[in-house]
Swiss-Prot record:
Catalyzes the oxidative decarboxylation of isocitrate to 2-oxoglutarate and carbon dioxide with the concomitant reduction of NADP(+). Cannot use NAD(+). This is Isocitrate dehydrogenase [NADP]. PANTHER family: ISOCITRATE DEHYDROGENASE (NADP(+)), ISOCITRATE DEHYDROGENASE [NADP]. Weakly inhibited by oxaloacetate, 2-oxoglutarate and citrate. Severely inhibited by oxaloacetate plus glyoxylate. The keyword Nucleotide-binding does not apply. NADP(+) binds at residues 83, 85, 133, 580, 585, 596, 598, 645. Disruption phenotype: Inactivation of the gene leads to glutamate auxotrophy and to the absence of any detectable IDH activity, suggesting that only a single IDH is present in C.glutamicum. Binds 1 Mg(2+) or Mn(2+) ion per subunit. Mn(2+) is the most effective cation in vitro. Mg(2+) can partially replace Mn(2+), resulting in approximately 40% of the maximal activity. One of its GO terms (molecular function) is isocitrate dehydrogenase (NADP+) activity. Its EC number is 1.1.1.42. Monomer. The lineage of its organism: Bacteria, Bacillati, Actinomycetota, Actinomycetes, Mycobacteriales.
Length: 738
């Protein structure tokens, strides 16, 4: 039997799964397809690390490792929903919840000194940050706005904040001594096993990474961010935001960049509270309160210090004296610096641009902002859009073009695979990458506390990326632009390989060019304003940034993107949108039993997954399901049956009901497959007859508080009861499986 894997993840998409997946299972079964769940939630991944500490009933398999292997086979057909990329505070909260539920798992050690503690820390580090996507992404990325969604937005545009020509909003970024400026890059002419080592000024050698296996043709880079230069830059920006009377905000990616960015976040916190750290720094650092887990962790940790109240007062004075901070939650006093994972650059910058260049201040009012993006590799993209909006005003969703993306992602490409090669430097000296025969391939002078890192990209993914770009340009008729920076050593190497591999393809009649990220941004937004479309062909980080930036401006959200990963072994990975897992949506369910999560991303991914089954295995019924689902999705949009934000109006469960009805209607009416038409005729009839009652019942359950039985590890039975509250609807769906 053909199989589709549906991932069980976290937060809002997990809740939605309990409503939608029974429908998917029932419909897929009519085409001979089994839908199997694999648990890659944060809780599931934690438990998989400690099998020896669990009872037989509690043990779970390592679903992520199994899916990683499956992704390397032609049989893979995986639907991947958003999951938590855990920061340390989230990880600690999940551990505590699991312990309270009776799981004998250890605490996360803050300072691992014994072998046992080091082993525990290594296991938790495997779960921390963006631990899922790099394992599953054995292919490059093809993300685009489906035509149905684009058409819907033109009819029902989302709100775009007006821009003022006098806006003081800007991006602040380093102009020297950051990752971009210090990068060195090589292309290996033969396979090798290299070593990364640190040689201190006194001659002491430390092996940072003993064995890094590299293939022929692989691109390897090393670079370093100077801690002194970073601190000087940050102090300047704190003063600048204060002088200009605008909000101070930091935009990093502490989830995916789980080694470098929490360190940088700590520098930001210490720079903002420079006076507090000048006075109490030694004591704070000794207590592990260095800012890397955010201001909230510091304030919590102060409770165990004798003079904690005194230091807390100093932090409060620091907030009064410093520039106003951008707020995550004004009502609760949660600032941009409270939690490293609260403000993630790829989501926060487009949201700011969409909102007139404003973020929220402590009075819950919009205000101009200084957006701190310390490393300058990609900051210019956002500054270019800001300057364009200052000059030309906000974009118009009813007329603007689209910017699909082809992203280099496979096999942990570039920065998003750098975590195991990123190091905080302990002492002044040099870092060297040394070949097996002792040649120094890359070398940097370093100082204590600098962040040094290496990135790699294998040759096969680069070839596949170029091929995918040509294919998408040919199929769509759009120009394709490779976003590569001639000022960066890595990008210069990549550009030479792009030119080499483009020669392997028929590019006649295609418009394919290579531009710097700033030039490519300007070209793309000039074309957007003329209603023209342009494919952005980017590395891994810009894949992530652009597939939030352009969809948020075009569609109001990145969750409505079609995200396909053609796996290099021939399988398919279908990601549901490009957004996160929406913790605020869960909060609303807990308070009001209303889930505003929009499953449009799941609907789009599911149709592509069925289509993959048709194309790979000749399953024509799967193709009929896909076409009918696309039509049902378009009808859902046009009839405005997507979830509302307000309690008492349609929510995620209601939208699932209407999708099911429209899908059954389409299947009953189609003439390609008589069996499916006959199967779905009574289903459609039952859903149409009961529509008013089912819709009313789904609205009636809203309004009261709910108990999920856990946040990271909710109770199965409670979730099922909350997400499938109407027996009449459930019986119609479940009857299909019999």
């Amino acid at each position: 039997m053909a199989k589709i894997i549906w991932t069980r993840t976290d937060e809002a998409p997990l809740l939605a799964t309990y409503s939608l997946k029974p429908v998917v299972e029932a419909f897929a079964a009519t085409a001979g397809i089994e839908v199997e769940t694999r648990d890659i939630s944060l809780a599931g991944r934690i438990l998989a690390q400690f099998p020896e500490r669990l009872t037989e009933d509690q043990k779970v398999g390592n679903a992520l490792a199994e899916l990683g292997e499956l992704a390397k086979t032609p049989e893979a057909n995986i639907i991947k929903l958003p999951n938590i990329s855990a920061s340390v505070p989230q990880l600690k909260a999940a551990i505590k919840e699991l312990q309270d539920q009776g799981y004998d798992i250890p605490e996360l050690p803050d300072n691992a000194t014994t072998d046992e503690e080091k082993d525990i820390l290594a296991r938790y580090n495997a779960v921390k940050g963006s631990a899922v996507n790099p394992v599953l992404r054995e292919g490059n990325s093809d993300r685009r706005a489906p035509i149905a969604v684009k058409n819907f937005v033109k009819k029902f545009p989302h709100r775009m904040g007006e821009w003022s020509a006098d806006s003081k909003t800007n991006v602040a970024t380093m102009d020297a001594n950051d990752f971009r400026h210090n990068e060195k890059s090589i292309i290996l002419d033969a396979a090798d096993e290299v070593q990364i080592k640190h040689i201190a000024a006194d001659g002491t050698e430390t092996i940072l990474k003993d064995s890094l296996k590299l293939l022929e043709g692989e691109v390897l880079d090393g670079t370093v961010l100077s801690a002194k230069a970073l601190d000087a830059f940050l102090l300047e920006q704190v003063a600048r935001a204060k002088a200009e009377g605008i909000l101070f905000s930091a935009h990093l990616k502490a989830t995916m960049m789980k080694v470098s960015d929490p360190i940088i976040f700590g520098h930001v916190v210490r720079a903002y509270f420079a006076d507090v750290f000048a006075q109490y720094g030694e004591q704070l650092l000794a207590a592990g309160l260095n800012g890397e887990n955010g201001l909230a962790a510091i304030l919590s940790g102060l409770e165990s210090l004798d003079n904690g109240e005194e230091i807390k007062a100093a932090f409060e004075k620091g907030l009064e004296d410093g520039p106003d901070l951008a707020m995550v939650n004004s009502a609760r006093g949660i600032t941009n610096l409270h939690v490293p994972s609260d403000v993630i650059v790829d989501a926060s910058m487009p949201a700011m641009i969409r909102t007139s260049g404003h973020m929220w201040n402590k009075d819950d009012q919009e205000q101009d902002t200084l957006a701190i993006i310390p490393d300058s590799s990609y900051a210019g993209v956002y500054q270019t859009v800001i300057e364009d909006c200052r000059k030309n005003g906000a974009f118009d969703p009813t007329t603007m073009g689209t910017v699909p993306n082809v992203g280099l992602m496979a096999q942990k490409a570039e920065e998003y695979g750098s975590h195991d090669k990123t190091f905080r430097i302990e002492a002044d000296g040099v870092v060297q990458v040394v070949s097996s025969n002792g040649d120094v391939l890359i070398e940097h002078d370093v100082e204590a506390n600098d962040i040094w890192r290496a990135c790699q990209v294998k040759d096969a993914p680069i070839q596949d990326w170029v091929k995918l770009a040509v294919t998408r340009s040919r199929l769509s008729g759009m120009p394709a632009v490779f976003w590569l920076d001639p000022e960066r050593a890595h990008d210069r190497n990549l550009a030479s390989l792009v030119e080499k591999y483009l020669a392997d393809h028929d590019t006649e009649g295609l418009d394919i060019q290579i531009l710097s990220p700033v030039e490519a941004t300007q070209l793309s937004i000039d074309r957007i304003r003329r209603g023209e479309d342009t494919i952005s062909v980017t590395g891994n980080v810009l894949r992530d940034y652009n597939t939030d930036l352009f969809p948020i401006l075009e569609l109001g959200t990145s969750a409505k993107m079609l995200s396909v990963v053609p796996l290099m072994a021939g399988g398919g990975l279908f990601e549901t949108g490009a957004g996160g897992s929406a913790p605020k949506h869960v909060q609303q369910v807990q308070e009001e039993n209303h889930l505003r999560w929009d499953s449009l991303g799941e609907f789009l991914a599911l149709a592509e997954s069925f289509r993959h089954e048709l194309n790979n295995n000749g399953n024509t019924k799967a193709g009929v399901l896909a076409d009918a689902l696309d039509k049902a999705t378009e009808k859902l949009l046009n009839e405005e049956k997507s979830p509302s934000r307000k309690v008492g109006e349609i929510d995620n469960r209601g939208s699932h009901f209407w999708l099911t009805k429209f899908w059954a209607d389409e299947l009953a009416a189609q003439t390609e497959d008589a069996d499916l038409a006959a199967t779905f005729a009574p289903v459609a009839e039952a859903l149409n007859t009961g529509a008013a009652d089912i819709d009313a019942a789904l609205l009636a359950v809203q309004g009261g508080a709910t108990d999920l039985g856990g946040y990271y590890s909710p109770n199965e039975e409670k979730l099922t009861n909350i997400m499938r509250p109407v027996a009449q609807f459930n019986e119609i769906v479940d009857a299909l499986k019999k």
